């Protein structure tokens, strides 16, 4: 997070494939999407991320043509598809349930869409075989869905979707039914498949780690509007507001009060009662309240014993959890605020594993913090 860790941002040269302009949608008088604008580029893996009820699945269904918009327009490849039926949109959807036909073999499931499109019979077998080969299920072609694992069923659903060569593939929480290990494996396979096919993927999930792992771009939604749109690293390291900061991973929020501006970048502030310099890229006034945000892994901790004096926020270890590569500690500051700290394991450091109630000093590298205006005192 913060100034010194920012990426060199590469210009996005991808051409737009889907344009959503001024999209609104209500159900039973309640607006679930409000004046939404979104561009989806050719060949990218875009994730719509947000809590349940934020409108992300509704956006997916509107693009697919499974719901109709109340206002606004949807363009696909420079064609207005706002009122085009779903079957004519060159868009395929993979649902959470996979929706495979239980009485059909894997081959017949994948071939179904081609037959519905009246594809010449001579083309069907090679195209289905190619699609199954891409998802490594060629030898399972004659099995029924109930004879497959959850991960294999998911790959059949993807093969059935890509065999039609859609311009756009929509995936609605399609990994959520898998166990943890298989889910991690499928995340890698899905991203590799997307790169191989060159098809634009739009993926819906509420799982932040999944979004960070798979996406070229993440759109964070809340209450039917977009809170932030950016690369995974931008979303994680440069959150635009407290909602995004808190929704993506663990984060610590410290209360700060401006003392004075030192220069164009730095402000002298009291952070939880400790004076320090913070990087602030917007106008502030003395006495103004701010939020200073730091990820657990961006904090430094040092044990305080009777014979040493260390600068920092003073607190006491209340919980400690060994996670293999990291040690995660909960430190209670002297004012009662709880702070999460994550340290990478170092077997050569005799002070690495802290005792409960150990007195600690918490600090961070200047400029690694993200500073936001206090939304309650605007």
Swiss-Prot record:
The protein's name: Spermidine/putrescine import ATP-binding protein PotA
Domain ABC transporter: 18-248
Similarity comment: family membership: Belongs to the ABC transporter superfamily. Spermidine/putrescine importer (TC 3.A.1.11.1) family.
Top-level lineage group: Bacteria
The protein's Enzyme Commission number: 7.6.2.11
The UniProt record lists the keyword Membrane: yes
Residues at which ATP binds: 50-57
Broad EC category: translocase
Keywords: ATP-binding, Cell inner membrane, Cell membrane, Membrane, Nucleotide-binding, Translocase, Transport
Function per UniProt: Part of the ABC transporter complex PotABCD involved in spermidine/putrescine import. Responsible for energy coupling to the transport system.
